[in-house]
Amino acid sequence: MCDNDMADIQSKLSSFCEEIRALALKEGYNLEGDKSPSSKPYFMSWPKEIDVNHPNFAFFTKLQFQYDKSLETILNSCYLQELQLDPTRIIETLQQHFNNSILRYADIENISDVKDESPMSFDTEHECTDTSEDISDKSEISSTNSDNPIQNCYPTYKRSFIKHESRGILEKIFKVKQCPNTSERLYIAQKLDLTPSQVRIWFTNKRMRAKKHTTGKGTKRKSKKYPS
């Protein structure tokens, strides 16, 4: 990852923090004065399975730098105290994401041939290209039809339940930003006590419904007959 990419990542995340602050002000939070911790560096810990002699250590070091900078931005610039977010929980969550990313590539011989699929990768074009409708959480496959071999050919998925209060906040964030990137979704998930997957699915479905509504209005407008 080049320096320009890192600068773009930090710019996006910093911008999102400011949007969250503006939203908090609109909702009545008193954010006068920045009570965020003084700026200081944070570093991800290495999984115990990895050492400096690992053949992919150079790649892992770059990945660690990406996580370090993202964590620093969140902890130093995102007004965690005002938004009642626990910094310790955020650190633990990002550390787990980092460990999973490292271990995913631990046994790959030629890391240069692998596309970076780290959970902290930021928006690519396909993430905001909605090609399906009403997506459910595919990580939770229902096995209620295990006695029916025909039905088993078509697995069903459990719908993720989101509380009414959380949906209201998601709706407000959607008005600010319709396609949050991976770190932003993680930040929102921490605030609302959801999983990043639930947040991603909600925004995907919301964009699909908004797009369908806009398309429908345009079609009706074109088909409307005006008196001559």
Swiss-Prot record:
GO CC, alphabetical: nucleus
Source organism (scientific name): Kluyveromyces lactis (strain ATCC 8585 / CBS 2359 / DSM 70799 / NBRC 1267 / NRRL Y-1140 / WM37) (Yeast)
PROSITE patterns associated with the record: HOMEOBOX_1 (PS00027), HOMEOBOX_2 (PS50071)
Compositional bias annotation for Basic and acidic residues: 120-140
Record protein name field: Mating-type protein A1
Top-level taxonomic group: Eukaryota
Quaternary structure annotation from Swiss-Prot or TrEMBL: Forms a heterodimer with ALPHA2.
SUPFAM superfamilies reported in the protein's UniProt record: Homeodomain-like
Keyword entries, A-Z: DNA-binding, Homeobox, Nucleus, Repressor, Transcription, Transcription regulation
Misc. remarks from the entry: There are three genetic loci for mating type genes in K.lactis. MAT is the expression locus that determines the mating type of the cell, whereas HML (containing HMLALPHA1, HMLALPHA2 and HMLALPHA3) and HMR (containing HMRA1 and HMRA2) represent silenced repositories of mating type information. The mating type is determined by the MAT locus, which contains either a copy of HML or of HMR. Diploid cells are usually heterozygous for the MAT locus.
Annotated Pfam families: Homeodomain
Sequence segments annotated as region (Disordered): 120-149
Cross-referenced Gene3D superfamilies: Homeodomain-like
Record feature DNA-binding region, as residue ranges: 155-214
Job of this protein: Mating type proteins are sequence specific DNA-binding proteins that act as master switches in yeast differentiation by controlling gene expression in a cell type-specific fashion. Transcriptional corepressor that acts in conjunction with ALPHA2 to repress transcription of haploid-specific genes.
Compartments reported by the entry: Nucleus
Family to which this protein belongs: Belongs to the MATA1 family.
Gene Ontology MF term list: DNA binding; DNA-binding transcription factor activity, RNA polymerase II-specific
